[in-house]
């Protein structure tokens, strides 16, 4: 029971934090679906714009994961100096990456719009939201450090605040100011920068007595920075694979032939996102606790933690399967204004693929917790190799099956991709033997 409390202490705040993210996406999709009489075109434009920023943010997620794993192990070992240095390094790297995105926004935007077949609506969205990127990357670094410090409450408070602000400003800008989906982008800028300010203030107040004096030369120590980037090199490769699969999913949907398929796949993917962000709460718990118990050299607690995190992820998966079986049509109707001309066509067409959404939670239960374990153990090579193999399978299945089953091939490829991620990490880690040995 004590371990379950430890898991829930970290998982529940992260679930609350994470569940606000798909809610924000759902609200954005709902706003797009109510902006004019052509829901499919507007939802599709927003989906492409969001996919571009998912590509950018996911490519920066190595900052969060690398910071979290190293910090958690230092926390478990009682190494206050390293935890302080990791915060400084996370902020420094985040600032450099975020500012680079601003400097190179035009070539990045032009390339992204060309690859994704983005129209003028997507372009307006991109060049508005790009100013939120430095803040978003900073939040990655800060939240990674807080996760490593076993603190899920501060990220929860900030996430709720950011998403409430984003939703409120989205309605205000999109409808009252008539800015359309560009208003949703500007709402993100306001919300993300507010989140950075809130996080910085809370961290300063809460941890001011737990920091030790450090120098700039220690922060920029080449040996330590090299270690940080070597760990994150593999995470970057893994992240690129994730970005490629999700971005390709939207791009392939857009190239299927009509706006209805793109709208349907966008909405169904939002339902999967509802599941993924909740299960990710237990992945964060596995991440923080795995690092902590490895740092503390406590193999017994490590085994108990991993086993119970896996059980919790399966429970969540079964819960979502039940929800999707019973209320899938009601959930879909939240996204579309029933007054628009193509609403019933979108919902009826989505029904053809709902079986995949019901099955995916079971296929995806294991990879989430395995990701958390590998991040906490800083086993980045295992994460990289499993992701490369899973991604190769994803594309092979899609291109092989598409001529035979059309859009079903995309969902089949995605389902098997998720399943393989978990299975491969389990076996590449010698059935977790490599993880347990780190705590001995």
Report each predicted region and the residues it spans:
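Small-residue-rich hydrophobic transmembrane alpha-helices
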Residues: 43-103, 139-155, 264-323, 364-378, ...
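Short runs within selected transmembrane alpha-helices of multi-pass transporters and secretion channels
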Residues: 61, 129-148, 155-163, 184-199, ...
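Helix-loop interface residues and adjacent transmembrane-helix termini in multi-pass membrane transporters
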Residues: 23-26, 34, 40, 74-77, ...
């Amino acid at each position: 029971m004590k371990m379950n409390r430890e898991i829930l202490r970290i998982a529940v705040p992260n679930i609350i934090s994470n569940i606000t993210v798909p809610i924000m996406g759902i609200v954005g999709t709902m706003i797009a679906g109510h902006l004019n009489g052509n829901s499919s075109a507007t939802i599709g434009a927003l989906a492409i714009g969001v996919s571009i920023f998912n590509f950018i943010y996911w490519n920066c997620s190595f900052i969060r994961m690398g910071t979290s794993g190293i910090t958690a192990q230092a926390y478990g070992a009682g190494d206050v100096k390293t935890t302080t240095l990791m915060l400084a390094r996370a902020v420094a790297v985040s600032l450099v990456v975020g500012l680079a995105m601003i400097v190179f926004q035009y070539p990045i935007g032009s390339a992204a719009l060309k690859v994704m077949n983005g129209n003028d609506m997507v372009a307006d969205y991109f060049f508005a939201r790009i100013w939120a990127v430095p803040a978003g990357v900073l939040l990655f670094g800060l939240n990674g450090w807080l996760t490593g410090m076993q603190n899920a409450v501060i990220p929860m408070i900030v996430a709720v605040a950011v998403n409430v602000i984003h939703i409120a400003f989205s309605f205000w800008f999109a409808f009252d100011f008539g800015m359309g989906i560009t208003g949703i982008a500007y709402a993100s800028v306001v919300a993300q920068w507010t989140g950075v300010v809130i996080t910085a203030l809370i961290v300063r107040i809460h941890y001011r007595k737990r920091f030790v004096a450090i120098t700039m030369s220690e922060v920029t120590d080449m040996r330590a920075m090299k270690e940080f980037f070597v760990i994150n090199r593999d995470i970057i490769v893994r992240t690129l694979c994730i970005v490629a699969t999700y971005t390709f999913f939207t791009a392939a949907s857009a190239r299927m032939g009509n706006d209805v398929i793109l709208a349907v796949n966008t909405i169904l993917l939002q339902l999967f996102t509802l599941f993924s962000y909740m299960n990710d709460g237990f992945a964060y718990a596995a991440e923080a606790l795995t690092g902590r118990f490895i740092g503390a050299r406590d193999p017994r607690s490590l085994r108990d933690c991993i086993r119970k995190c896996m059980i919790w992820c399966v429970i969540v998966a079964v819960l979502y399967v039940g929800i999707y079986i019973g209320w899938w049509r009601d959930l879909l109707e939240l996204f579309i204004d029933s007054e628009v001309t193509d609403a019933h066509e979108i919902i009826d067409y989505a029904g053809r693929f709902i079986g995949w959404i019901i099955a995916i939670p079971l296929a995806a239960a294991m990879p989430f917790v395995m990701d958390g374990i590998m991040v906490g153990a800083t086993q980045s090579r295992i994460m990289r190799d499993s992701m490369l193999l899973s991604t190769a399978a994803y594309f092979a299945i899609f291109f092989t099956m598409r001529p035979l089953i059309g859009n079903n091939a995309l969902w089949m490829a995605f389902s098997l991709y998720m399943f393989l991620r978990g299975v491969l990490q389990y076996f590449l880690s010698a059935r977790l033997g490599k993880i347990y040995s780190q705590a001995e």
